[in-house]
Amino acid sequence: YVISTVYMENDVLGFGQIKDRYQLALDLFDVRLMIEPEIVTWACRKATKEQIAKLRELCNEVEMLYKQGHNHIQKDIEFHSYLAKLSGNMVVERLIPVINTSVVIFANITYRSLMQETLETHRAIVNSIEHKDPVGAKCAMNMHLTYNRQVIMELLEKKKKVRKNHEPDDI
């Protein structure tokens, strides 16, 4: 299961040149933790009923694809991109390529290891926005990103151990 790198086409920040994909994914998640919880608080304030219905539809599509074993990445990117759009902030909308890069890199590294957590936190984000609950939306997004970040941290730790075990002794 290989995910296309077509999302790197707007690579104005040069992420495609970075060799350490694990560290890049971690750093991108750190940036997402700085930005996305605020995005959903703004979405709570600004989203219309029609927009919330579309967000729920995207959430359901991600879930259906994920559960059926299909590639859900494009829909997941649409979900997060739509959240950014709902914030009503044109700068945030232009930050979408950074967010999309993170989703693709993370999916390549972890391949479906957080399905249940992803589905539950996506639903919690949508429900919180629907109920105009910015604190709930922010908490759900923090949980979503923290689960993902933790997996990256564990993978980085394993990678470091493998490297250490393959280094010659300094005797």
Regions found by a protein language model. Name each.
Residues M8-Y22, I52-K54, I73-E78, R149-M153, ...:
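Short, charge-rich amphipathic segments
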Residues Y1-M34, T41, V162, D169-I171:
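Short linear motifs at protein or domain termini
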Residues V135-I171:
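C-terminal effector-binding regulatory domain of bacterial HTH transcription factors
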Residues L114:
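Short beta-strand-centered segments that line the small-molecule binding cleft or hinge
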Residues L28-N108, E117-V126, G136-Q150:
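Conserved amphipathic alpha-helical segments that form helical-bundle/coiled-coil interaction surfaces
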Residues I129-K132:
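Conserved short acidic donor-positioning loop in nucleotide-sugar-dependent glycosyltransferases
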Residues Y111:
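A glycine-/small-polar-enriched, mobile loop at the entrance of the PLP active site in fold-type I
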